[in-house]
A protein has these predicted regions:
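Hydrophobic/aromatic-enriched cytosolic interaction surfaces used to assemble or bind macromolecules
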Residues: 1-292
Length: 292
């Protein structure tokens, strides 16, 4: 399900890190239940798809260096999980999809060029062709992020002795905490960024990431309601479950209202490795993917 750039059969990286505006969640993949968090000063990271996210590079470099093991000069392989809003993730459907990689990229670029707010020529583009039954449309998951943004996130880790060979986004990694049953909606709130992912079984059907003016129940519903309506139109069925992550008290208090407004069961997303939050959901999901 994820767009991690992993070669089949490769062992997992030794470390995994998730970056947010609040800090760095991290852990060793050999001990997935032992996840920690190191806060960052306010303003060190400011997430955007349009500009450099690392506003205080010296501060980020110092905090990452503090996480490095004593033998950091050995270059430990690491997975790096980026904030959702610095990238763009979409699900494109095709009646037919070419087998040639270059033709695939050209077709994807043609379809998505006018929908992203940055230059495709300077972006890193990954795509995953999801399995489809004969006669069904082919759903392709596409993730794009400006190359310079990725480089700026990776640099302090490389300097500290880590080798971030795998890069994904928080919501994409968090999908590994969702059991592939029926139609499920995952909603993840991180600050004012709301990510919505909809799965039918293990197939991703919708990916949205919206910056809210404020994290109120009304603003959240203004994103969730159209998402449910879209799924009803496209899949001819309502989501059976809404999984919440990062909503804190708002989610606890508003869950009954959302259940009534959306007509779906509402519950928190869960992981065997801890309580998923706005700062570690991607990390815990990544750990779940290694255990699968």
């Amino acid at each position: 399900m994820s767009l991690l750039n992993t070669l089949l059969g490769d062992p997992p990286p030794a470390w995994a890190f998730e970056i947010s505006e609040s800090g760095i969640a991290f852990g060793r993949t050999a001990t997935p239940g032992d996840v920690s968090f190191r806060p960052l000063p306010e303003g060190a990271i400011s997430v955007s798809p349009l500009r450099d996210n690392v506003q205080l590079p010296d501060v980020l470099a110092r905090e990452v260096a503090a996480l490095a093991p004593p033998d950091a000069h050995h270059h430990h392989r690491a997975a790096l999980i980026l904030p959702d809003y610095c990238a763009r993730t979409a699900v494109l459907d095709f009646d037919a999809f070419p087998a040639n990689h270059d033709e695939q990229r050209a077709l994807i670029s043609f379809r998505i060029r006018k929908t992203v707010p940055f230059d495709l020529e300077s972006a890193i583009v990954s795509h995953y062709v999801q399995p489809a039954a004969t006669g069904e449309k082919i759903d392709v998951v596409v993730a794009l992020v400006p190359q310079e943004i990725v480089i700026r996130y990776e640099t302090p880790f490389r300097t500290a002795g880590f080798q971030p060979g795998e890069v994904t986004t928080s919501a994409m990694a968090a999908l590994h905490m969702v059991k592939p049953e029926g139609i499920t909606m995952l909603a993840k709130l991180a600050g004012l960024t709301l990510s919505v992912m909809v799965l039918r079984g293990s197939t991703l059907k919708l990916a949205r990431c919206v910056e809210l003016p404020e994290a109120t129940s009304a603003e959240i519903l203004s994103v969730l309601c159209p998402s449910v309506a879209y799924i009803e139109d496209e899949l001819l069925a309502r989501p059976e479950k809404l999984l919440l992550c990062g909503f804190g008290r708002v989610g606890d208090e508003e869950a009954p209202l959302w259940r009534g407004e959306l007509g779906v069961e509402v519950e928190p997303v869960r992981s065997r490795y801890g309580m998923p939050s706005s700062t570690n959901a991607g990390l815990l999901g990544y750990m779940e993917s290694l255990a699968a």
